[in-house]
Amino acid sequence: MRVIVLGSGVIGVASAYYLARQGAEVTVLDRQSGPAEETSFGNAGQISPGYSTPWAAPGIPFKAVKWMFQHHAPLAINLDGSMWQLQWMAQMLKNCNPQSYAVNKERMMRVAEYSRDCLRELRKDTGIHYENRAKGTLQLFRKEAQMEAVQRDISVLEECGVSYELLNANELGRVEPALANAQDKLVGGLHLPNDETGDCYLFTNALAQIAKELGVNFQFNQNVEKLIVEGDQIKGVQVNGKILTADRYVLAFGSYSRDFLKPLDLQLPVYPVKGYSLTIPIVDPAFAPQSTVLDETYKIAITRFDQRIRVGGMAELSGFNLGLNEDRRATLQMVTQDLFPGGDMEQASFWTGLRPMTPDSTPIIGATRFKNLFLNTGHGTLGWTMACGSGKLISDIVLNHKTDISTDGLSIQRYSHAHAA
């Protein structure tokens, strides 16, 4: 079976790898010069199934209003003049209730836990290296109210069988020794020992090389113009004015998937949520993290690679604007220097990317009303966490194999206005 995968971020490359491993003849098309050159390039580096939590949660509307008046707020809303932005925010607000939160959380955890299992198996099979560590994730609380509020998440972790440890301020240094210097600023933390870290860019490029050895044909610097439709099927994809054909097509264009599908009357509810990161060379390992630390107050992740610290976070609703906002850099620097001042901030590189976010925070993985068109997008901040599981899942769906986990609630069908079959 011939399959064309559109997109070479971590989701597209993982999809291509698993398809090829199961015998498909795969071609990957991308406008960039290589894999992982956009959203997968500089993400926070955490692989955190236990923190797979919907952004649309009870209390978020109130918090969003409060954040509008804070200098170092984790969320910023800049109206881009589009009706779509307002519609997407309205859809998200509809999910900010306990019932929707529970449903969405289960779907996200299902994919994320499966994905971690797939990653571990892939690592065992290939020996792939991406500066990975398996030392868990530590969520830090600066306020007692945060320690109390985390009980809701703990109950979900227990239901899902996720290992955790609730720590007081004096115990944080046992997990992250450098935090002994910041103990007076913190009240405690939640440690998930089974989470992992790694450089998504290194991983995606290494996996692309492995996929090439399996026969995957990567075509970069391609202007992917449109899909050619005939009835309920895709007959080809127009690239640089020429038509390429396959038996099946997988769309993994991230935030750009929605506009690409507009001519097909598939209304994909994916909005670009802008995030930022700093990559900082380490000069004093004693003041650097061992794994990933999440600052609950500022919603920022600080992750250890081999000789670098990756600091990622923020959420900005401003359309497809890729400008670098120095105020966001100041927030990332402030949090890092407050907790882990072991990096050379003058040598830090500042980056931004667009996360493809759905209103319910759950990715869109599965079939469409077109018999041979499949979607793998909408992973939001969890593309790295969910990549391998999503790739394996979509490969099984495309090839009509039995899936390892339930696909209930993952396809575009859950959005009735999307005309999905």
Swiss-Prot record:
SUPFAM superfamilies: FAD-linked reductases, C-terminal domain, FAD/NAD(P)-binding domain. FAD binds at residues 3-17. One of its GO terms (molecular function) is D-amino-acid dehydrogenase activity. Pathway: Amino-acid degradation; D-alanine degradation; NH(3) and pyruvate from D-alanine: step 1/1. Keywords: FAD, Flavoprotein, Oxidoreductase. GO terms for biological process: D-alanine catabolic process. Its EC number is 1.4.99.-. GO terms for cellular component: cytoplasm; plasma membrane. Gene3D superfamilies: D-Amino Acid Oxidase, subunit A, domain 2 (3.30.9.10), FAD/NAD(P)-binding domain (3.50.50.60). The keyword Transcription does not apply. Its cofactor is FAD. It catalyses: a D-alpha-amino acid + A + H2O = a 2-oxocarboxylate + AH2 + NH4(+). Oxidative deamination of D-amino acids. Belongs to the DadA oxidoreductase family. HAMAP family: DadA (MF_01202). This is D-amino acid dehydrogenase.
